Amino acid sequence: MPKKFQGENTKSAAARARRAEAKAAADAKKQKELEDAYWKDDDKHVMRKEQRKEEKEKRRLDQLERKKETQRLLEEEDSKLKGGKAPRVATSSKVTRAQIEDTLRRDHQLREAPDTAEKAKSHLEVPLEENVNRRVLEEGSVEARTIEDAIAVLSVAEEAADRHPERRMRAAFTAFEEAQLPRLKQENPNMRLSQLKQLLKKEWLRSPDNPMNQRAVPFNAPK
C-alpha cells in the first residue's frame, strides 16, 4: 500500500494565514480609530479653553475702553463747567442719548443761574419796625403802674404785633438768611447760589423764626 501524506495541507495553511492577517489588520484599524478619537476629543478641550481665554481677554479690553471713555467725558464736562476749553481728543463719534440730554441739562442750568453778584440787603437797608410797646403807651390805652399792668401792656403789645406778621416778614427773612446762608454754603460746598437759596427758602417755610409760623391773631379779632 502507498504511504499516507503526512504533511500540512497547503490550502488550509494559506486560509488560516489570510484570516490571521485580516484579523490583525482589523485590530490595527480599530486601535487607530480609538487613538484618533482620543486626540480629537483632547483637541476640542484645548480649543474651548483657548476660546474662553480669548473671550475673557476681549471683555477685559472692552471694559477698560469704556472706563477710559467715561473718564474722558467727565474731564471734558469739568473743563466746560470751569469755563476752560474742553480738550480735543480723537475718539469715536458715538454719543449716547443720555449723554446728550445730560449736557443740554447742564447748559440750561448754567444759563438759568441768577447773577451771583446780587447781594442780600443788610439790616441797615430794611426800614425799622414801629415800637409797639411805645405806641400803646403813647396812645394812653394802658398805663403800667403795677406788675399786673406791665403784664397787661406786654400782652396787648404782643397781640398788636401778631395781628400783622407780614410786616416783620422781610426783616425776619433777611436776618434768617444772614444767619443760615453761611452754614448752608459750608454744608453744601458744591451747590450754586441759586440752589442754596432754594434750600434756604425751604428751611424758612418750616422755621419758627418765620412770623407766619407764629401764632397769628385774626385781623378782625376783637380788641
UniProtKB/Swiss-Prot annotation:
Modification sites for Phosphoserine: S141, S194
Tissue expression per record: Ubiquitously expressed.
Chain residue ranges for the region called Disordered: 1-126, 204-223
Biological processes, Gene Ontology terms: cell division; transcription by RNA polymerase II
Subcellular location: Cytoplasm, Cytoskeleton, Microtubule organizing center, Centrosome; Midbody
Any one GO CC term of the record: cytosol
Keywords of the record: Cell cycle, Cell division, Coiled coil, Cytoplasm, Cytoskeleton, Phosphoprotein
Compositionally biased intervals (Basic and acidic residues): 18-74, 99-126
UniProt xrefs under Pfam families: Ccdc124 (PF06244)
Chain segments annotated as coiled-coil in the UniProt record: 15-82
Keyword Cell division applies: yes
Record GO terms (molecular function): RNA binding; transcription coactivator activity
Quaternary state and interactors: Associates with translationally inactive ribosomes in the nonrotated state. Interacts with RASGEF1B.
Family the entry assigns: Belongs to the CCDC124 family.
PANTHER family the record matches: COILED-COIL DOMAIN-CONTAINING PROTEIN 124
Function (record text): Ribosome-binding protein involved in ribosome hibernation: associates with translationally inactive ribosomes and stabilizes the nonrotated conformation of the 80S ribosome, thereby promoting ribosome preservation and storage. Also required for proper progression of late cytokinetic stages.
Name of the protein: Coiled-coil domain-containing protein 124
Organism field: Homo sapiens (Human)
Native organism taxonomy: Eukaryota, Metazoa, Chordata, Craniata, Vertebrata
Gene that this sequence comes from: CCDC124
